[in-house]
From Swiss-Prot:
Summary of the function given for this chain in its UniProt record: Hydrolyzes both 3- and 4-linked fucoses in Lewis determinants. Not active on neither 2-linked fucose nor on fucose in alpha-1,3-linkage to the innermost GlcNAc.
Biological process annotations from GO: carbohydrate metabolic process; glycoprotein catabolic process
Main location (coarse class): secreted
Protein encoded by which gene: FUC1
Protein name as catalogued: Alpha-L-fucosidase 1
Residue positions the entry lists as glycosylated: N22, N82, N248, N320, N355, N487
Source organism (scientific name): Arabidopsis thaliana
């Protein structure tokens, strides 16, 4: 009997120890996301970073920007049109999708619409049997990049424009053609522009949105007010220094949204509506023989102020009257890509030992600070709950020189950070000195410094957040192109022999 009791307690003890061991190995759950959150298509759109706009149509041949809708269709004759060239240039330059003006304000359709004769079927191109949308859709699919389509609400050719029901039926029919004949569409672009003195027109936006989501559920819809993507409020490609993906759609109206609200978003917004920054590589949106492209360094500056401010960079690269992207533009895009890749291919922070003020769970947690050196949304640093400070520390064996800071949030968990700053230690005194400050982060925040910083000890401090901050990536880079690297500020700290040995052993 005693031996049975002893055996019972032995197995009970083993079972208890096993349960304790299993309990201690359980992972701390992920923190709760904070609303609003991006949809799957919004998330994919934001991670795409850059898209190429293609303004093309009769305006390309009439040397105009806003066509009257009266140009003879026969003028449209791009004899060397090659949509594969457009797509390959976009892909080689790092763009995730192309967006074509299938119909601009002049009403001319780049596909053979069954609802108007004012289209490619009335032109000389391909003897009236051509379809620009079809050729681009095929090229994009083959290259593996997304396709977006622009369908102007304002139509200067269509006679029923101004007749509310009749024109909305016309527009919805053309939209249906585009969304059912050309495969998967990633973005539908609705321009809020309309000239002064034009006919009054009520658009059935809610019906349009419902139809688009019904026919192309993976597409995002762009307009001044969303519902999925908003306009940044200018045509210079520049976002606000504070830029939330949060937005209140009830505070916005297509064609009449306060520019500052579009620029900054709304930290208290109830909707997730990230911003898109559109700008043309040339002075005009359509190709003009008399115009030249912006220099590559200017595109780099726009990249910092769009992608680097939590937005998508939509760069217009208009095909010329031959139907090709001009060599001038190609050269600029190649230079821009080389600059961008040269800067961001080498994250100097990867050389650092990273620590933090706290970790959600414990030191063996899946939310440790080393996660910020790995790209991707799945891993991130999360501090312990209810802390009064949120800090990441970076220590380097050797001096590191940089003039660009990158921070990313795992936006599938919501946008959280409202302000932050970077500090480095002074030589000799060891006191912390602020280098740069910023506000929102979101998908990606890039900050350039006036001076190059040389340091061994850094700390990133989150000053304010909507809830406990999460950081998915941290980068330090050297930009030798922007003109901000002429001055060097050497900021170092002497360490004890023990500290040096600890770093040496990493």
């Amino acid at each position: 009997m005693n031996s049975q009791i002893t055996l019972f307690f032995f197995f009970f003890s083993i079972l208890s120890l096993s349960q304790i061991s299993n309990s201690s190995s359980l992972l701390k759950p992920h923190p709760c996301p904070i609303l609003p959150l991006p949809s799957s298509q919004q998330l994919q759109w934001q991670l795409g970073s850059m898209a190429m706009f293609l303004h093309f149509g009769p305006n390309t041949f009439t040397d105009s920007e806003w066509g009257t809708g009266k140009a003879n269709p026969s003028i449209f004759n791009p004899t060397h049109l090659n949509a594969s060239q457009w797509v390959q240039i976009a892909k080689d330059s790092g763009f995730s999708r192309v967006i074509l003006t299938a119909k601009h304000h002049d009403g001319f359709c780049l596909w053979p619409s069954e609802y108007t004769d004012y289209s490619v079927k009335s032109s000389q191109w391909r003897n009236g049997a051509g379809d620009v949308v079809a050729e681009l859709a095929s090229a994009a699919k083959e290259a593996g990049i997304g396709l977006g389509l622009y369908l102007s609400p304002w139509d200067r050719h269509e006679q029923c424009y101004g007749k509310t029901l009749e024109y909305n039926e016309f527009y919805l029919s053309q939209m249906t053609e585009l969304l059912t004949k050309y495969g998967e569409i990633k973005e539908v672009w609705l321009d809020g522009a309309k000239g002064d003195g034009e006919k009054d027109m009520e658009y059935f936006f809610d019906t349009w949105f419902s139809l688009i989501h019904q026919l192309q559920p993976k597409a995002v819809i762009f307009s001044d007010a969303g519902p999925d993507v908003r306009w940044i409020g200018d045509e210079a490609g520049l976002a606000g220094s504070t830029c939330w993906s949060l937005f209140n759609r009830t505070n916005a109206k297509i064609g009449d949204t306060e520019p500052s609200y579009s620029q900054e978003g709304d930290g208290y917004g109830q909707d997730w509506v990230p911003a898109e920054c559109d700008v043309s590589i040339r002075p005009g949106w359509f190709w003009h023989a008399s115009e030249s492209p912006k220099p590559a360094v200017q595109l780099l500056d726009i990249y910092y102020n769009s992608v680097g401010r939590n937005c998508l960079f939509l760069l217009n690269v208009p095909p010329n009257s031959s139907g090709l992207i001009s060599e001038q533009d190609i050269k600029v895009l190649e230079e821009f890509s080389e600059m961008k890749n040269s800067i961001f291919s080498n994250n100097l922070a990867r050389k650092a030992f990273v620590n933090s003020s706290s970790i959600r769970g414990d030191q063996s947690s899946q939310f440790g600070p080393k996660n910020v050196l790995e790209e991707g949304l799945d891993k991130y640093w999360a501090p312990e709950e209810n802390q009064n400070e949120w800090v990441l520390y970076l220590e380097f064996k050797d001096l590191v020189s940089f003039n660009v800071l990158e921070i990313r949030e795992p936006i599938h968990m919501g946008q959280r950070i409202a302000s932050f700053h970077l500090e480095t230690r002074k030589t000799g005194s060891g006191e912390w000195e602020r280098v740069v400050s910023g506000t929102t982060v979101g998908n990606k925040r890039l900050l350039r410094f006036l001076n190059v910083v040389e340091s061994r000890s850094l700390k990133l401090v989150v000053d304010k957040a909507r809830t406990d901050p999460l950081i998915s990536y941290l980068g330090l880079y050297m930009d030798k192109f922007s003109g901000s690297s002429r001055n060097t500020t050497k900021i170092t700290i002497t360490r004890t022999l023990k500290e040096e040995q600890q770093l040496h052993d990493l």
